[in-house]
Amino acid sequence: VKTRSVLESVSPYNPPRLREEISVDHGSERYVKLTMNELSFGPLPEARAAIVETLSRAGRYPDRDATPLREAIARANPGLSPDNVVVGNGSSETLVDLMQILERPGEVVIPWPSFPFYVSAARVVGLNARKVTLDGHHRVDLDAMLAAVTDETRAIIVCNPNNPSGTYLPLAEVRRFAEALPEGVLVILDEAYYDFVDDPAYAGSHGLVLQSENVVSTRTFSKVHGLAGFRVGYGLAPRRLADLVWSTHVPFSVNQAGQAAAAASMGQPEAIAGRSRLMKRERERVQDAFGAAGLEYVPSHTNFVMVGAKPRLFEKTGVLVREGEALGYPVGWSRVTIGGPEENDRLLAALG
């Protein structure tokens, strides 16, 4: 069988493996999993009810166009219409769909450390990934990314807030950056952690999408909405780019339970904002404890924190965290998901 030789050197995205047991003396309690930036609360009650309601239709294909969901997303982003919204099996699929529409060969410029999936996704669709190091404050370095643009550049991904550093860029900086780029370069704003940032200077990227021909935003229902297991993400894009994405998109990739749950969750903005506030309080508690223990950490605006400690430190109280080297950070760093209050109590018990 003739296959694409480039795939021989592509490593698949490798999320942390689940461990049913860890070698620590922690009685009969199960471990606490704080590795993947999930929300321990799960779906809102309205989303749960919507999921149950779809069971009677489980033998039918879902709405290919996800029309009610796209309408709900458009309503939440004033000025955009459902024609500006694409959906995917998680925002990861939307990222791949966006890369699929780009001319090849070419490059995608990405920040680093950042979401490792960018590298494998680019390679799989036939693009190279050029990494640009974060600045001294662990932020995406827009000046350095602009300097990295060449005639081969097809897209630039700005993870904002950035995973795994947890830092963000104000919208004004992103706007200036996008305006300075050649028109033929696509700007992909990966905003998976959008809902956790409460700074007014951050919000409003949908307006930038509306005013541009080369800016798109991707978001997900896997984080603050608590729907990671249902795999629903979306993109906001100029109409021409949205149409191209639909032309490459795998039909029916977003199941009907996920569509219904996501639409129901979008209809509860106050509840979602309340979850974000709780995460902020818990994040500040965790960061304060890290500081009091003398641990270096990166001040975060998301539901995770990068801390200068090895995962083994937290395993002694039955807590699993993500090793930093898997995400581009040096050995000796960990990314810690902010859990619920009781989970964070277990996490902080490791500090003594």
Each language-model region and where it sits:
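N-terminal small-domain helix-loop-helix segment of the aminotransferase-like
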Residues: 2-90, 97
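Short beta-strands and strand-loop turn motifs
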Residues: 33, 131-133, 155-161, 187-191, ...
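PLP-dependent aminotransferase class I/II
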Residues: 44, 214-291, 295-297
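Conserved PLP-binding catalytic core of the aspartate aminotransferase-like
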Residues: 279-280, 284-318, 324, 334
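PLP-dependent enzyme catalytic core of the Aspartate aminotransferase-like
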Residues: 79, 172, 326-352
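Active-site pre-lysine segment of PLP-dependent enzymes
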Residues: 123, 130, 140-152, 164-187, ...
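PLP-dependent aminotransferase-like
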Residues: 100-158
